[in-house]
Amino acid sequence: MIDKLKLVDHVQAINWNRIEDEKDVEVWNRLVNNFWLPEKVPLSNDIQSWNTLTPEEQQLTMRVFTGLTLLDTLQGTVGAVSLIPDAITPHEEAVYTNIAFMESVHAKSYSSIFSTLCSTKEIDEAFRWSVENENLQKKAAIVMDYYTGDDPLKRKVASTLLESFLFYSGFYLPMYWSSRAKLTNTADMIRLIIRDEAVHGYYIGYKFQKGLEKETEERRQEIKDYTFNLLFELYDNEVQYTQDLYDTVGLTEDVKKFLHYNANKALMNLGYEPMFPKTVTDVNPAILSALSPNADENHDFFSGSGSSYVIGKAVVTEDADWDF
């Protein structure tokens, strides 16, 4: 006989007028102000540009986006959700639910790109590839192990590394195309995603550091060793994944520099020193320029608006206005 679910004696409503950590409100407001949906980005304007890519470049782009979809799916349905039980404040819980929702929006946004630019057969082949690619599946499995484990700090480390590091082998390509005036509307949407992930990685890293403050020196060292070992493991796999994708177009070494750069940023979010020296983090200036808030379509990273992000405006009309 299955035991009945044990219910708590009472449920406490979240009170946004009593804040324990101001960072919760700050990040919540940032995420809400940054809210966007893929349907508002005119991706169809990229069809002509898409047709200028070679079949190999189109396949690479689809595989990159399918890999990003897998990570967003993992983060939206498992990663962010796994952080909720360990939240210190109800407002922290609310932020994690926001993060989980936006990860699902990100995952859906790639399907919007596919349905606009690709055939059903091409889409199915790309998703089949994501299941069969060993390195892609391996990085998902590595992170999943810690999401389902019983150590709250290690979950936050794994989540921060995914948000601030693992996505970036994929984010490189749309920025590369954008720097060459290709797929600029798609790149605009990817910038919106990158803006979200930057906030996610920062916030989860912040909560990790707050939790670490309560631990003993021995425990802190254990977590630091774990963090660098996990990053090494993920990096080694990511290099193989990058080679598998980018060798055919000769971009592997540039992408690796981008990985080094973002690995250091992930460690910074966790409060640790960089792992890679500056000599191997000299990212192509064109990529950094494409990442900037005023790149290409002039998106405003902080308001969620931009020339490619379209929101309808209401205009007062009279009956006579509809007589054509």
Q: PLM ranges: what are they?
A:
Residues 1-324:
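Non-heme di-metal
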